[in-house]
A protein has these predicted regions:
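Short alpha-helix
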Residues: 119-135
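A conserved beta-strand element that flanks and buttresses the S-adenosyl-L-methionine
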Residues: 65
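Short catalytic micro-motifs in class I SAM-dependent methyltransferases
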Residues: 68-72
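Class I SAM-dependent methyltransferase SAM/SAH-binding core
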Residues: 11-52
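Short, glycine-/aromatic-enriched active-site segment of Class I SAM-dependent methyltransferases
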Residues: 97-118
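A C-terminal cap/extension of S-adenosyl-L-methionine-dependent methyltransferases
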Residues: 129, 139-182
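Conserved class I S-adenosyl-L-methionine
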Residues: 2-8
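A short glycine-rich, Lys/Arg-flanked "PGG" loop and its adjoining helix->strand segment in the class I
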Residues: 79-91
Length: 182
């Protein structure tokens, strides 16, 4: 079948979780990450993801994932990424992008800025809109990794609920979507 592609594959953690029945390809800029993938027998390419995608034929990939990558892209690069995903995915193909959730004030104000290569936070509503605008279907936002409940306020009031949502809510989110059928 068609390959599953992981952009920003790191040391291959996600590639190793994908079914071996599929061809799995990791793309990463970091040579040490690519070497770590090779040492595990994983196929990985050291290349800019946009360049790699541009070299692929239309409708040639089953799914594209990118965990904690899109926050490193300019708006123009994110647009190009979505355009290339739309082009190379086979009909019904899937994208999965995970990124820090700026709805969580702690994540947005502190954790996001611990990585100087993060360009800007991407609110879930914006990402959902852009993915839909680019023609993807079945677009869903999945809020992930809430701060442990023991850190939340210990009272039942509207103020506590709102504070919990803003400070202790999901630290990340994923957007999933499918390319339409022909």
């Amino acid at each position: 079948g068609l390959p599953l592609v992981d952009i920003g594959c790191g040391r291959g953690e996600w590639l190793n979780m994908l079914p071996e029945a599929y061809a799995r390809i990791g793309i990463d800029l970091n040579s040490m990450n690519v070497e770590a993938c090779h040492e595990q027998g994983l196929k990985a390419v050291q290349q800019d993801a946009l360049v790699w995608l541009a070299e692929q034929p239309e409708n040639s990939v089953a799914a594209i994932s990118a965990f904690h990558v899109i926050e490193h892209l300019s708006f123009e690069q994110f647009n190009m990424l979505l355009d290339q995903c739309q082009r190379v995915l086979a009909p019904g193909g899937t994208i999965i992008f995970e990124t820090p959730n700026p709805e969580n004030i702690i994540s947005a104000a502190t954790h996001f800025h611990t990585d100087p290569t993060h360009i800007h936070p991407l609110p879930p509503a914006f990402t959902e809109f852009l993915v839909e605008f680019k023609g993807f279907e079945n677009v869903e936002i999945h809020r992930l990794n809430p701060i442990p409940r023991e850190y939340a306020l210990n009272e039942d009031s509207e103020v506590a609920r709102r504070c919990d949502a803003l400070f202790y809510g999901p630290q990340d989110y994923a957007v999933t979507a499918r390319k339409g059928q022909l």
